[in-house]
Structure formats: structure tokens, C-alpha cells
């Protein structure tokens, strides 16, 4: 409607374009894979702040982060298409947005890397499948309440970074925020398979 268009034109567009610019700025091109990657981040799950025994913070290619980046970039490009020509030109001038940068957004939004386990499970981040399975039953038996698992492990001189254990929904957040159709479109755009069973399979795993 008219009010939405007005908001988009004068406030929303500038915000989403700047957010897209941020995602573009933290994407790194990997020439060996011809894919873009987002390195050294923490996804929604606070149990994984770094790789086991690494002194560098963050993990690489968190699926939630990478998909959200692709979504923002595609929405930003759509917004520019929606704006009246004069407003679009004005915004591009104010933000110093040129065709080359928009071309980069387009490229990143089609070549962002996602990582999968061998069986097609979406990896929470690169290397998640190499982590150790956590002994949930053993720890419940030993401690009863293991809600603060991070504190329990740290008291034992251990860290949740080593285990397949999550404090917050991470990959699963994607299925909450996007419909299966939206996710299929994003995966298709990236050239990755998204089957009918992808969602139940991942929900079951995580």
C-alpha cells in the first residue's frame, strides 16, 4: 500500500541497503570453491564461540548466518527494483552505491557457501560434523539439571565447543523464520539441493 511504499522509500530502503553492504563487506571470496564464505562468526548458538583448541574466536560458514546474509542481499536488490527511478538514483548517489557493488551483491547472493554433512544434513557450521557426540544420559545421571551445561563443562576443565550440543536453535531457526518455499528458493538460488525431506531430517538431527 501507499504508506508502506512511502516508508520503504524514505526509511526502509536505506536501512536494508546498508545492512546488505555490511554482509557483503564480511563475505570472503574463496577462489578454489568459487564460493563466498563468512568466517570467524558466532551463530545463534552460544555454545560454539570457537573451534576446539583454537585461540581464534568464531566459527566458519554458520548456516544461519550465511542464509540470512543471502536473504538480506536478495531483498536489498528487490527493494531497488521496487523504488521509483528518481528515488533509486537519489539513494544510490547518497550511499555511493554503484553498479559494481550491486553486481557483487548479486554474485554473493548466488555463490554463498553452505556446508553439509555427508548425509545431506545442513552443517550448523563448517566442521560441526567432526565434533564429539555428547553423553547426554551420562551427564543427566551425574548432575540432574544440566541446563547450564557450559558451566558444568568449564568446571571440569572442558568446553562445549568440543561437542555436538546446542544452547539455542541455530539451523532450526531457519525453519522458524522461513517457509519451506522461501528456503527452497534460497537454496535453488545458491545451487544447493533442498528436498521435501530436508526440513524433517534436519529437525530430527538437531
Label every model-predicted segment:
Residues 1-5, 20-24, 171-181:
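Alpha-helical support elements that line or immediately flank enzyme active sites
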Residues 10, 66-67, 74, 78-81, ...:
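Active-site core of glycosidic bond-cleaving carbohydrate-active enzymes
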Residues 13:
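Short conserved active-site loop signatures built around small residues
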Residues 1-10, 22-106:
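The feature captures the catalytic groove of carbohydrate-active enzymes
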Residues 16:
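Conserved functional hotspot residues or short segments at active or partner-binding sites
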Amino acid at each position: 500500500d501507499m504508506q508502506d511504499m512511502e516508508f520503504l522509500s524514505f526509511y526502509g530502503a536505506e536501512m536494508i541497503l546498508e545492512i546488505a553492504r555490511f554482509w557483503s563487506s564480511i563475505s570472503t571470496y574463496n577462489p578454489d570453491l568459487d564460493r563466498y564464505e563468512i568466517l570467524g562468526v558466532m551463530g545463534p548458538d552460544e555454545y560454539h564461540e570457537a573451534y576446539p583448541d583454537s585461540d581464534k574466536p568464531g566459527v566458519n560458514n554458520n548456516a544461519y548466518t550465511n542464509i540470512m546474509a543471502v536473504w538480506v542481499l536478495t531483498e536489498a536488490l528487490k527493494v531497488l527494483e521496487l523504488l521509483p527511478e528518481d528515488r533509486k538514483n537519489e539513494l544510490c548517489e547518497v550511499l555511493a552505491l554503484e553498479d559494481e557493488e550491486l553486481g557483487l551483491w548479486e554474485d554473493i547472493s548466488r555463490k554463498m557457501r553452505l556446508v553439509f554433512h555427508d548425509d545431506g544434513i545442513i552443517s550448523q557450521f563448517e566442521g560441526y560434523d567432526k565434533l564429539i557426540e555428547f553423553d547426554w544420559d551420562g551427564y543427566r545421571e551425574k548432575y540432574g539439571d544440566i541446563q547450564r551445561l557450559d558451566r558444568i563443562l568449564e568446571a571440569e576443565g572442558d568446553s562445549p565447543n568440543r561437542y555436538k550440543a546446542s544452547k539455542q536453535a541455530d539451523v532450526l531457526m531457519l525453519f522458524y523464520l522461513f517457509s519451506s518455499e522461501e528456503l527452497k528458493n534460497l537454496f535453488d538460488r545458491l545451487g544447493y539441493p533442498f528436498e521435501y525431506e530436508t526440513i524433517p531430517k534436519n529437525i530430527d538431527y538437531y
